[in-house]
């Protein structure tokens, strides 16, 4: 890691860290709050959304500062390029959609076409796969001109599909405190290392900036969370990670180039694939939320909130490690590493099955740590939320004063912790 990478990371981290409390207050003021209305939602009390705005602020300011101070003239030229303009416009669409959705939830059939437009803008202006190679086209006998045309069409379609798919994949795993942000951060670390190995300095700077922006937000998002990043953050992270992977590893679609980003982002990708298959098999709309995601299943096994997140961090990091080995060491060492990880993973799963406890009571106290019990007791005591003093919690109808009382500020929470 070079000095300018550290600068990019540090600036993003500082801005994101100090912006998050401000965004939290803003979310409460505008009513961007997640209300725990069903069993699918793991949190027990109303939680401010819009945390993604702090991540975005740290990311954008750090990117501008790092590139502008490195060479201002090149930075101006870079901003004026069609590709950059397309990324900016596409990102603004995703951010605007996310903010609106956090304040006034939208249906998937409304969000998807808008996300599709954002992805098409990005791809049409140059952020796309440029070459399709073996075994994708060479096995088909056709005229060279038709091959080039089909290659361009497929490359465009694959690029759009990848960006839209990953934008939603990160959002779908955003079900536990710190999960989506942490997994995105691990993916950004993997992409950073891959880009450094390949000598792609611009990609490395952007990845380092994303790492810093996420790191600044995570202290507020770890369990017990004080704020969620919401659709604003989850869709933005997925969108940017998709663009980074296209620019960094997917310019030419070979088996190797496709394997790297799929491994780096394997957890959200495979969780999304299984969610789609699961819903289709049960005859449900693929956009209908359920409690069948991997993180839900870990909780249902009896794991604590933090343990479930930690396990998924390890899985994501292991996949990222394989992608790095694939770039740096080649195919054979990567296969050996995969075998080692699978063996340890199976052993860990066996031990996990033995130590997890099936909850015997409805409160599931047997699976919580003392610290988690204290957090839950604090939540139950605070403003009488669990006793129904705020009647609007179940139907989501709360005014700003009620939201502020239900959520509580940091100082009141600390006082409760001291009393306990």
Locations of regions flagged by a protein language model:
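"…together with the soluble PPM/PP2C metallo-phosphatase catalytic core" -> "…together
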Residues: 1-270
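Membrane-interface capping segments at transmembrane-helix boundaries
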Residues: 22-25, 348-362
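Cytosolic, membrane-interface loops and tails of multi-pass inner-membrane proteins
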Residues: 22-47, 274-306
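Generic hydrophobic alpha-helical scaffold/packing signal
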Residues: 216, 242, 264-267, 274, ...
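Alpha-helical transmembrane segments of integral membrane proteins
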Residues: 300-318, 324-327
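Long, low-complexity, intrinsically disordered cytosolic termini of multi-pass membrane proteins
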Residues: 305, 357-420
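Extracellular/periplasmic helix-loop-helix junctions in multi-pass membrane proteins
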Residues: 323-337
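Alpha-helical membrane-embedded segments
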Residues: 340-344
């Amino acid at each position: 890691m070079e000095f300018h990478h550290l600068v990019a990371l540090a600036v993003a981290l500082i801005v994101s860290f100090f912006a998050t409390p401000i965004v939290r207050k803003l979310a409460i003021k505008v009513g961007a709050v997640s209300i725990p209305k069903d069993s699918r939602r793991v949190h027990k009390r109303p939680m401010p959304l819009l945390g993604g705005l702090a991540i975005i602020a740290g990311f954008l300011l750090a990117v501008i500062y790092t590139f502008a101070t490195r060479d201002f003239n090149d930075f101006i030229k870079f901003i004026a390029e069609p590709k950059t303009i397309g990324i900016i416009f596409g990102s603004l669409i995703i951010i605007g959609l996310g903010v609106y959705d956090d304040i006034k939830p939208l249906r998937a059939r409304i969000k998807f076409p808008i996300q599709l437009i954002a992805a098409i803008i990005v791809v049409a202006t140059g952020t796309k796969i440029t070459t399709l190679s073996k075994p994708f086209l060479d096995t088909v006998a056709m005229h060279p001109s038709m091959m080039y045309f089909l290659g361009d069409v497929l490359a465009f379609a694959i690029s759009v599909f990848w960006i839209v798919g990953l934008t939603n994949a990160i959002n779908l795993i955003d079900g536990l405190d710190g999960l989506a942000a942490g997994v995105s951060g691990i993916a950004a670390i993997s992409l950073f290392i891959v880009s450094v190995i390949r000598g792609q300095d611009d990609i490395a700077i952007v990845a380092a900036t994303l790492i810093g922006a996420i790191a600044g937000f995570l202290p507020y998002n770890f369990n017990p969370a004080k704020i969620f990043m919401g659709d604003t953050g989850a869709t933005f992270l997925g969108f940017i990670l998709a663009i980074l992977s296209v620019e960094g590893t997917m310019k030419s679609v070979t088996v190797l180039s496709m394997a790297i980003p799929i491994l780096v982002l394997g957890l959200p990708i495979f969780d999304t694939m299984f969610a789609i298959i699961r819903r289709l098999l049960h005859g449900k709309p693929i956009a209908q939320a359920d409690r069948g995601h991997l993180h839900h299943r870990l909780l249902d096994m009896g794991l604590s909130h933090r343990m479930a997140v930690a396990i998924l961090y390890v899985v994501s990091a292991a996949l990222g490690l394989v992608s790095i080995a694939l770039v740096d060491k080649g195919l054979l060492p990567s296969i050996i590493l995969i075998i080692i990880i699978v063996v340890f993973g199976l052993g860990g799963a066996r031990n996990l099955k033995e130590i997890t406890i099936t909850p015997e009571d409805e409160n599931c106290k047997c699976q919580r740590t003392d610290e988690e019990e204290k957090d839950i007791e604090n939540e139950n005591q605070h403003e009488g939320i669990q006793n129904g003093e705020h009647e609007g919690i179940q139907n989501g109808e709360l005014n700003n004063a009620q939201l502020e009382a239900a959520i509580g500020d940091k100082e009141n929470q600390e006082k409760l912790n001291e009393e306990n």
